[in-house]
Structures are given as C-alpha cells and as structure tokens.
Amino acid sequence: MALKIRLARAGSKKRPYYHVVVADVRAPRDGRFIETVGSWNPVLLKDAERVKLDAERIQHWIAQGAQPTDRVLRFLDQAGIAKRPSRNNPTKGEPGKKAQERLALAKQAEEEAAAKAAEAAAAAAAPAEEAASE
C-alpha cells in the first residue's frame, strides 16, 4: 500500500481549510485517510497558527515509507522536519529556438550597422586628412 502525506480540503465555500493527512494514494482527496497529522489554514496570513504539524507522527509515517506531496514537503521544510531539495532548472529561463534566431539576426544587423558607421566615419575623416596635407 503506497502512502502519501497530503492535504485534504475542509471548510466551507470560499473559506478553505486543509487537514494534513496520511492516506493511500488510491483514496479520494477528501475521502478515506489513515491519520490526521496536521492542519493548514491559508486564510491566516503570517500567523503561528497557520500551519500546525505533529512532527513525531510525521516522522513515524515517513519512516514507514509515506511520501509527502510537494506542498506538504514545503511545510515540513519550513518546520525543519524534512529537507526539500531546491529545484534549479537554469535552462527553463532561456529563450526558445525561434527567439534565439531572432536575437542572432538582430545582433548581426546591429554589427553590420556599426561597421557601416565606422566606414562612413573613416571615409569622412580621410578626405579631411588629404585636404589638410595639400
């Protein structure tokens, strides 16, 4: 039986409240669960009562093989119960192929314009030097 430590929604409409529960992965989100090990009230902002966790029971269930979901793992990391590895994906922020092609074309056009401007400046300076030497 695969176990997850996950959130089960409670509360009324537009007033969410979540229980942190240990449940079988096949059970419905708000359905059958094995044990409640905490709660999360997202309505409370920056409050000590916002997230309540039973650290001892959570560690017990993790030792039994229960896997916390990403959101619960964030709570456990903040509480110092479990370590959440950082998700660093530097390639995700890079532009796509088409955008890179457009950037390369724009850079090439800019370099050509700079080269033409340098040639024009050199050509304008050359006749002035010839006139000065005569």
UniProtKB/Swiss-Prot annotation:
Residues 115-134 have a biased composition (Low complexity). It comes from the Bacteria. GO terms for cellular component: cytoplasm; small ribosomal subunit. InterPro entries: Ribosomal_bS16, Ribosomal_bS16_dom_sf. Keywords: Ribonucleoprotein, Ribosomal protein. Gene3D superfamilies: 3.30.1320.10. Residues 79-134 are annotated as: Disordered. Pfam families: Ribosomal_S16. Coiled coil: none annotated. GO terms for biological process: translation. GO terms for molecular function: structural constituent of ribosome. Belongs to the bacterial ribosomal protein bS16 family. This is Small ribosomal subunit protein bS16. It comes from Brucella suis (strain ATCC 23445 / NCTC 10510). The gene is rpsP.
